[in-house]
A protein has these predicted regions:
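Extended catalytic core of nucleotide-activated donor transferases of GT-like folds
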Residues: 51-53, 71, 81-172, 282
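C-terminal alpha-helical cap of glycosyltransferases
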Residues: 394-414
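Nucleotide-activated donor-binding/catalytic signature segment of Leloir-type glycosyltransferases, i.e.
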Residues: 255-284
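N-terminal pre-catalytic "stem/leader" segment of glycosyltransferase-like enzymes
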Residues: 2-114
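Aromatic "clamp/platform" in nucleotide-sugar-dependent glycosyltransferases that forms part
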Residues: 298
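A short, well-ordered alpha-helix in the C-terminal region of glycosyltransferases
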Residues: 362-369, 376-390
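Conserved donor-binding/catalytic core segment of Leloir-type glycosyltransferases
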Residues: 51, 202-222, 228-232, 244-245
Length: 414
């Protein structure tokens, strides 16, 4: 109930909620630490310990990304510690991953794998773990301009890493020139998980189309209603039977968004909704059990699930705009044409600017072709897997991150 009331307050009085949840913590953070913080110079080699603060124990895309960063650095022999701040920042700790004990003050590197509002809240609560450390903010954003409320966080970081060029450009527009903004994509290992349709009640004779998203990341941005419309357009012209699976989380925190999705689905027998957290193993199994991933998102900072689907050898149909273009091309995915429209987000998370409206008819036509043509679908999946393996494999990204920590630069850095 408390989470639902909080969501209602954000919809009805976003400016007041911003003042309470972001501006007041920013003042507390400055009073406790910001006024005396000094930038920590880059060393020729990264100081130890290296701490990755993030939502390691939470069932969130941000948590998955933080866990991937830790695994990537550890694979290079780097001594790295995962500090789980999930419960400190209001998220349930559902996975026994990461250490909940705050690190001590003193030399080292702190990679804060959370966006500025959460970083400010964490520092306002307890600045000691950041004392004396080189702080790298790992941030992601889905629009062409970052919120003005992010600006106070720039004083607390010595460098910024981002998952895509799209996010890099958004942050560079707002960041002081002293701050390097480096593109360090999420590592995406090639999946070896075996499919098991019986585990989820999926028809073995159907082509399975998956659309998965967090309702807290807003229904407007993830745009599943357009995905549903495209699927209905596709199955009206296909010869093969197909099922659309919506895998969601966050329905309890975004009940109005969940209700809208349920209303749109209605009593359709070829659409399934799974609205519950899955273990990492179950989530990977669900992805392995599908044939096509469909994402008519209006914007993505990176699109981790899209990259994971490609790594699993799945055909992907996705809006051809924003962060996913870093690793998607016409031969490795279906890039759906779009028009840019003004942002309209009833959940109040995204305000101002423009984002993409995918061409639903074009998406439906492409989806129908993939449903009916096994050879076409499988060939695209193989090309996608090869491309992601070459560009986003853990050793590739781990080496890049290690270079950044050791003081080297890259072409995509400022």
């Amino acid at each position: 109930m408390l989470k639902q009331l909080r969501a209602l307050a954000w919809r009805c009085a976003p400016d007041l909620c911003e003042a309470i949840s972001v501006r007041l913590p920013a003042l507390r953070a400055y009073r406790r630490y910001g006024w005396r913080r000094r930038a920590v110079g880059r060393a020729t080699t990264a100081a130890v310990p290296i701490v990755v603060a993030g939502f390691h124990g939470a069932v969130l895309g941000l948590g998955e990304a933080a866990r991937g960063l830790v695994s990537a650095l550890a694979s290079t022999g780097t001594a790295v510690r995962a500090w789980d701040v999930s419960e400190r920042l209001g998220h349930a700790r559902r996975l026994d991953l990461g250490d909940t004990t705050a690190p001590a003050a003193g030399p080292g590197v702190m990679i804060a794998h959370m966006n500025p509002p959460e970083l400010i809240q964490l520092i306002a609560t307890d600045p000691m773990p950041f004392e004396g450390k080189r702080v790298i903010g790992y941030w992601a954003w889905e629009l062409a301009r970052v919120p003005s409320l992010w600006k106070p966080a720039f004083r607390y970081v010595d460098e910024i890493w981002v998952p895509s060029r799209f996010t890099a450009e958004a942050i560079r527009r707002a960041a002081p020139r002293r701050l390097a903004v480096r593109v360090a994509p999420h590592p995406v290992p090639v999946s070896r998980t075996a499919p098991d349709r019986g585990r989820f009640g999926l028809d073995p004779d159907h082509v399975i189309v998956l659309s998965a998203f967090d309702l807290r990341s807003t229904l407007a941005r993830k745009n599943p209603l357009a995905a549903l419309e495209a699927f209905r357009s596709a199955v009206a012209r296909t010869r093969r039977p197909a099922t659309l699976v919506f895998k969601t989380v966050g329905g309890a925190e975004a009940p109005a968004a969940l209700a809208s999705l349920l209303t749109a689905i209605g009593d359709a027998r070829d659409v399934m909704l799974i609205d519950q957290p899955l273990s990492v193993a179950d989530r990977d199994c669900l992805l392995a059990s599908c044939d096509i991933l469909l994402s008519l998102h209006r914007s993505e900072g990176f699109g981790l699930l899209l990259a994971e689907a490609m790594a699993a050898g799945k055909a992907v149909v996705a809006t051809g705009w924003s962060g996913n273009l870093d690793y998607m091309g016409d031969r490795t995915a279906v890039l759906v044409p779009y028009t840019l429209i003004s942002v309209d987000d009833p959940q109040g998370v995204y305000r101002g600017g423009r984002w993409a409206q995918a061409d639903v008819e074009a998406a439906g036509s492409a989806l129908a072709d993939l449903i009916d043509d096994d050879a076409h679908r499988e060939a695209m999946g193989r090309r996608a897997q090869e491309a992601v393996g070459a560009q986003l494999a853990t050793p590739v990204i781990a080496t890049l991150m290690r270079r950044f920590l050791d003081g080297e630069t890259a072409p995509l850095s400022r």
